[in-house]
């Protein structure tokens, strides 16, 4: 450097203590200019320069570093290598004139910047002019960095006293700042446009009513026992990219499309049969936790032997029923496993209706007449049900027989029934001697050529055990005569038809179960009064319809009951409470009859 101080040394100087360079370094002294002092201080450990700023030069450096400082050091506190400063006057340093100009630029840059003033605030700080006279109190309130800004004054004003009221205020759920800055205002009605003034413009529109908003009220304290329904969490709400694909928890309600099919369910009959080629025949039972995860696709590798472990969780054991389920057919899940037959409820007391049968469809029963000269044909001494329809009873066998058309509701019978009391001097039939009973009605024997249906032993199965012997004989006679001579018809004597006055037909109803009905049977020339209590229809309605026991078991075993041996109608007096008791004596045939009085 031509116009500067030469700093190139031929050899490195030795170590010297801090502060000065030794005089023994003759080589350094010889190479140095003559105007330099032989002893000049080095950089101090506190980084304070002892040289004048005008003698500094960046190229004038000592290649020997100073000793480490006594204080603690760090990476940021290393001793800097300051350039050497020269002593002497300025005219003797003509070679370092450029060094002074460089130093001036460094001093301008190294000047510390002043601290910036804090901005003045209307509510917190108050600025005052400096030319005003300030008292000692005001001087103490000066800001530390801003002398023209005063510190805030303490507000010593008294607080407003709030009168205490007896009523406790309502507890609000929002913060108190919102209540202070949000004054409550009374609701204002919302006025809409009056369409009635312009009715021609909108004639078909109905007039609008005046809407008023709901008055706003403070929210009361929430009860802990009845909390309000929690809102939807923030994680489940829809954002910019839309709602989340899956909820964060696993406890979610299963969708109706994913329904597990149980074993043993029949496939839907309307669906076509599925193919079985692309699905395996059977799979291993999966764990119950496999259905909770996400369904995986089917990846089958032909080269691997354990390809069954890579099947999807939706592949079921029955491959025929798997395809409709994967295609989304909800009806293919089958029907209910409850395949029991429908059980019809048992009929109630009033649900069984006995309808009449037309005489054209039902064959007529031909009962042979075995009457003597003085025998009178009795009628059926039993009451009728409240309904005015003719009763017919369905018995176990399939045959149907009915009484002649003259006995039905079209023609009046030749011998009607009279309900009432007869003279006491008439002897009942059970008090007559055996000889008189045999003379009055001698029961004929059954024909030996009768079939198995007309056998007397078959009729005994349907008769109660507590009947008298003469009643059993009369029932057997009528049963055998029905199959022995089917061509005969029922005939009634006409001697009583002219003697009895014409009486209109009436129906007798059983109002109470304790009502006793007294009738009579004509045995020969002696009318025999019989009396028996009428039982309520509730006592036998359930048992007679079930068919658990023969209906003839409900016949009353009264010693005063008597029966004639001429016709089938005389045997029905033993069952006044059961409409099927008289018909069950013929082995379960179907009868149709009506009663007149």
Curated annotation (Swiss-Prot):
Bias-annotated ranges (Basic residues): 389-400
Region ranges (Disordered): 62-82, 160-198, 218-315, 329-411, 535-586
Comp. bias intervals (Low complexity): 273-291, 535-574
Organism field: Ononis yellow mosaic virus
Name of the protein in question: 66 kDa protein
Compositional bias of kind Polar residues: 64-80, 218-234, 305-315, 575-584
Family: Belongs to the tymoviridae protein p69 family.
Biological classification of the source: Viruses, Riboviria, Orthornavirae, Kitrinoviricota, Alsuviricetes
């Amino acid at each position: 450097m031509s116009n500067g101080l030469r700093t190139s040394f031929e050899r490195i100087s030795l170590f010297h203590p801090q502060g000065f360079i030794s005089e023994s370094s003759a080589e350094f002294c010889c190479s140095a200019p003559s105007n330099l002092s032989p002893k000049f201080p080095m950089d101090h450990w506190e980084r304070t320069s002892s040289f004048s700023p005008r003698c500094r030069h960046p190229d004038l450096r000592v290649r020997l570093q100073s000793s480490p400082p006594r204080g603690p050091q760090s990476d940021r506190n290393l001793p800097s290598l300051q350039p050497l400063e020269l002593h002497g006057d300025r005219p003797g340093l003509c070679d370092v004139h450029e060094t002074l100009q460089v130093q001036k630029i460094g001093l301008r840059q190294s000047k510390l910047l002043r601290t910036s003033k804090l901005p003045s605030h209307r509510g917190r700080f108050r600025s005052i002019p400096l030319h005003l006279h300030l008292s000692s109190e005001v001087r103490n309130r000066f800001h530390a960095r801003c002398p023209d800004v005063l510190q805030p004054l303490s507000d010593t004003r008294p607080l407003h006293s709030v009168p205490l009221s007896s009523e406790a205020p309502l507890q609000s759920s929002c913060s108190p700042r919102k209540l202070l800055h949000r004054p409550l205002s009374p609701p204002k009605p919302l006025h809409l446009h009056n369409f009635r003034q312009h009715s021609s413009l909108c004639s078909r529109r109905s007039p609008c009513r005046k809407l008023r908003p709901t008055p706003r009220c403070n929210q009361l304290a929430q009860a802990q026992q009845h909390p309000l329904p929690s809102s939807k969490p923030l994680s489940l709400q829809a954002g910019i990219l839309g709602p989340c694909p899956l909820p964060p928890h696993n406890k979610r309600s299963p969708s109706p499309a994913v329904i597990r099919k149980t074993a043993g369910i029949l496939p839907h009959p309307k669906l076509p049969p599925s193919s079985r080629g692309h699905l395996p025949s059977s799979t291993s039972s999966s764990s119950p936790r496999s259905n909770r995860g996400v369904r995986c696709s089917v990846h089958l590798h032909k080269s691997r032997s354990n390809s069954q472990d890579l099947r999807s969780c939706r592949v079921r054991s029955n491959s025929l029923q798997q395809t409709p389920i994967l295609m989304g057919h909800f009806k293919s899940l089958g029907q209910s496993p409850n395949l029991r037959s429908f059980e019809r409820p048992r009929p109630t007391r009033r649900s069984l209706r006995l309808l009449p049968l037309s005489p054209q469809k039902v064959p007529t029963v031909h009962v042979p007449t075995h009457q003597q000269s003085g025998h009178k044909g009795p009628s059926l001494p039993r009451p009728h049900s409240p309904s005015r329809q003719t009763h017919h009873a369905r018995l176990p066998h399939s045959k149907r027989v009915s009484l002649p058309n003259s006995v039905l509701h079209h023609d009046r019978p030749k011998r009607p029934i009279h309900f009432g009391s007869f003279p006491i001097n008439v002897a009942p039939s059970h008090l007559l001697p055996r000889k008189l009973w045999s003379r009055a009605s001698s029961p004929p024997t059954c024909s030996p050529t009768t079939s198995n249906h007309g056998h007397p032993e078959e009729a005994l199965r349907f008769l109660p055990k507590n009947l008298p012997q003469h009643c059993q004989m009369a029932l057997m006679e009528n049963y055998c005569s029905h199959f022995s001579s089917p061509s005969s018809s029922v005939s009634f004597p006409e001697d009583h038809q002219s003697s009895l006055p014409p009486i209109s037909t009436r129906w007798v109803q059983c109002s109470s179960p304790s009502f006793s009905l007294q009738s009579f049977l004509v045995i020969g020339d002696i009318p025999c009064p019989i009396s028996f209590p009428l039982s309520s229809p509730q006592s036998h309605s359930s048992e007679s319809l079930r068919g658990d026991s023969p209906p003839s078991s409900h016949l009353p075993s009264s010693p005063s009951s008597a029966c004639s041996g001429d016709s089938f109608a005389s045997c029905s007096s033993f069952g006044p409470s059961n409409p099927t008791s008289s018909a069950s004596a013929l082995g379960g045939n179907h009868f149709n009859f009506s009663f007149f009085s």
